[in-house]
């Protein structure tokens, strides 16, 4: 996908996001994980609706972290452009995943370029359904994400709705059903995310980070 040119006030490497309102994220299926259950570092391809590769996402974690903490593990996620330059960085610290411990819910810091904070994703305390807040670099809530009561994709897609602060729905984050074999023998996931075309590019990037947190 060609890089849009002349985008003012846009972090380098995020120009792609100004011209799209939907992204598809496909996790690479690792044969070692499928046959042995050994947890490998996750890798993803980020595409537009035409199937063109926009970014690559690579998890940076230690083996012990992956095996001991599983899906709740802390991680750093590097987002690379088509030239293999790191343009986004997601950091998720180790936190408790239980709603019964509201003092240490899930959180993620989003930086672009790496080292420059552009937003945060924070889990909100909720008993029945998963709730998250998308925040800007100043910690101000911009969007809210609300998930379903059941977040397991048993035989269908799982949708998380995205709302403005006044309750207007503006997008979705969807975990897509990938079939019986892939769902039961690997943790490889496919996701879709959509948002308004004119949404601030930093908020779009933070929503992409939310996809890896929820």
What is the role of each PLM region?
Residues 1-76, 82-87, 92-107, 113-117, ...:
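Low-complexity or membrane-interfacial segments used for flexible interactions
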């Amino acid at each position: 996908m060609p890089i849009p040119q002349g985008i003012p006030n846009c972090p380098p490497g995020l120009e792609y996001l100004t011209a799209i309102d939907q992204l598809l994220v496909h996790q690479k299926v690792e044969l070692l994980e499928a046959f042995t259950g050994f947890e490998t570092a996750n890798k993803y391809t980020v595409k537009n609706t035409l199937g063109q590769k926009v970014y690559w996402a690579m998890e940076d974690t230690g083996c012990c972290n992956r095996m001991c903490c599983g899906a709740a593990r802390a991680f750093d996620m590097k987002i690379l452009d088509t030239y293999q330059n790191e343009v986004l960085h997601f950091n998720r610290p180790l936190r408790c995943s239980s709603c019964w411990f509201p003092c240490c819910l899930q959180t993620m810091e989003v930086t672009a370029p790496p080292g420059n904070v552009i937003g945060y994703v924070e889990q909100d305390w909720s008993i029945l359904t998963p709730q998250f807040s998308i925040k800007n670099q100043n910690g101000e809530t911009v969007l809210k994400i609300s998930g379903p009561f059941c977040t397991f994709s048993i035989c269908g897609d799982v949708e998380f709705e995205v709302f403005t602060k006044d309750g207007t729905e503006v997008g979705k984050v969807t975990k897509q059903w990938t079939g019986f074999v892939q769902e039961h023998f690997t943790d490889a996931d496919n996701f879709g995310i959509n948002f308004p075309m004119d949404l601030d590019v930093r908020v779009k990037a933070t929503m992409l980070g939310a996809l890896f947190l929820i």
